[in-house]
């Protein structure tokens, strides 16, 4: 499933997050399939807030949350194709 993944962390944790990001990048490369895939990589929308567009299973997303907790808080919003929704809607009538 595809998601918009919003993230935020405390400004005081910036150096910890930068260090852990290097660890995450290496871990992600060494363990394909363990973590979500990035369709649109992380981007900042503010000082310590950001978003990315990802695709993953619940298990892959759990692995991301486990890796980053408690440094970064995430909120995942599912993305659905409008055409499929409209098709299903029309069938329900």
Provide a role label for each language-model segment.
Residues 49-51, 73:
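A common structural microfeature
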């Amino acid at each position: 499933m595809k998601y918009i993944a919003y993230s935020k962390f405390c400004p005081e944790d910036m150096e910890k997050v930068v260090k852990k990001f290097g660890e995450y990048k290496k871990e992600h490369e060494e363990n394909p399939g363990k973590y979500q895939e990035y369709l649109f990589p992380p981007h900042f929308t503010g000082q310590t807030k950001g978003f990315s567009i990802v695709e993953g299973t619940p298990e892959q997303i759990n692995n991301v949350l486990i890796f980053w907790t408690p440094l970064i808080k995430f909120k995942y919003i599912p993305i659905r194709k409008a055409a499929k929704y409209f098709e299903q809607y029309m069938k329900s009538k």
